[in-house]
Structure formats: C-alpha cells, structure tokens
Regions:
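Alpha/beta catalytic cores of nucleotide-metabolism and tRNA/nucleoside-modifying enzymes
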Residues: 3-4, 209-211
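SEC14/CRAL-TRIO lipid-binding/transfer domains and related phosphoinositide-recognition modules
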Residues: 1-93, 109
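Eukaryote-skewed repeat-based solenoidal scaffolds used as protein-protein interaction platforms
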Residues: 47-48, 55, 67-208
Length: 211
C-alpha cells in the first residue's frame, strides 16, 4: 500500500496537516484581524484597495469550488486582502453526513494552507443539526474573531431553532472574542457582535432608493 503523503489526491500531496478530532480536521490558528470592508470572493479580481478589505465566501459553493481544485492558483489573489474568511462550504441537514464532514475538512484544509502562506484567516463557523456538534467545531480556535451567517435560516421555524442551538454551542465551546455577523441578527444572539449587511439586504436597499 502506498504511503498516503505521496499520493496526489485531494490535495494531500501539497500538505498533510496534523488533524484535530476523530476526522483529523486541520487547525485554524488564531489571527489578529483588522479590516474596513467585507466583500465576496466573486468580487475579488475586480476589487480596488484590497489591503483594507476582508474576503468572505457567503456565496453558492460553485463560485469557489475552484479554490479547492486549484489552491495554488489563488494564493497571490487572496494574499492581497487584509484577511480572508475560511470557505463557507455548505452543511445542509439533508446532505449525507460524509459530505458534511468532507466540506468541513475542505474548509479547514484551505484555511490552514492559506495561513502557511502568511494569509490571515477568520474562521467561518457553520453547523447543520445537533449531531454535527460532535465534529463541526473541530479545528476552530478559541477566543478568536469568527464569522457566521444567518442568511437562509430565519424564515423557517425549524431552521431558526437549529441556528440558535448551534449559536449557543459555538459560544460555549469557542468563546469567541468577536463575531462578524453576516445577515439578520436574531434577538436571542449575544456576545461581541459586529453586524455586516448581507448582499440581499444591500440589493433591496438599492432597489428602494431607485423608486
């Protein structure tokens, strides 16, 4: 049997990190973070004054799958920004558990790989249901600045409950010093929260101004 570190498979030949937990999730280190604006990866190439901005991935997964497929091709682009969020690969509750864990692993592998190249990373915290709590916080730093999104979770009773349960669990386990909150903030959420308007909100505001 081949030694796995020499197999060009799922980026293992690029770097093999020591992992955390049962699924060997790469660790994201705690970084000191400062930025003036929060923009999506889909605007990265056209962005001006990128040194003052943080790059996020609150987008459809297909828009940043290429980062996993060709990670070295995007190091120079990403390194132009003040900091970058770890990729927000989806953890939908109806996804098979294996896919959810794989997406969590990919998020952490890319974030840890970027940190190896001197890029500052904000951990994007995500979960699906209560069962995911067994692994979805593996590899996340404690007492760090983190980011979460409530987009798509507040228009359904069950989704909203799952979001709040995960939020409470995040606060207990990670004790974040600051939470960059993308989207609507439920009244039950607490902590040192900095709200960022989601693209959908900004779009609605523009449409209202045009009337």
């Amino acid at each position: 049997m081949y030694d796995r570190k020499f197999v060009a498979y799922e980026n293992l030949s690029k770097f093999l990190f020591d992992g955390i937990g049962d699924y060997e999730i790469p660790l994201i280190k705690k970084d000191d973070i400062t930025f003036d604006d929060f923009i999506g990866f889909n605007f990265a190439k056209s962005c001006k004054n990128s040194k003052d901005k943080c790059l996020h991935f609150y987008l459809d997964d297909y828009q940043f799958t290429r980062l996993w497929n060709r990670p070295n091709n995007y190091i120079n682009l990403i390194s132009q920004f003040s900091c970058v969020c770890s990729p927000d690969y989806s953890l939908y509750t109806d996804f098979p558990k294996a896919i959810q864990i794989y997406n969590h692993y990919r998020k952490h592998w890319l974030a840890a790989y970027w940190q190896l190249h001197g890029i500052k990373v904000i951990p994007t915290i995500n979960w699906s249901d209560k069962d995911s709590f067994a692994w979805c916080f593996d590899g996340e730093p404690k007492n760090a600045t983190v980011t979460i999104s409530s987009v798509g979770t507040q228009n359904d009773k069950i989704k909203r409950l799952l979001f709040l349960q995960g939020y409470d669990e995040m606060m207990k386990r990670l004790e974040p010093k600051k939470i960059i909150f993308y989207g609507e903030i439920p009244k039950e959420c607490y902590g040192n929260i900095v709200r960022v308007k989601a693209f959908q909100e900004k779009f609605r505001e523009v449409k209202l101004d045009e009337r």
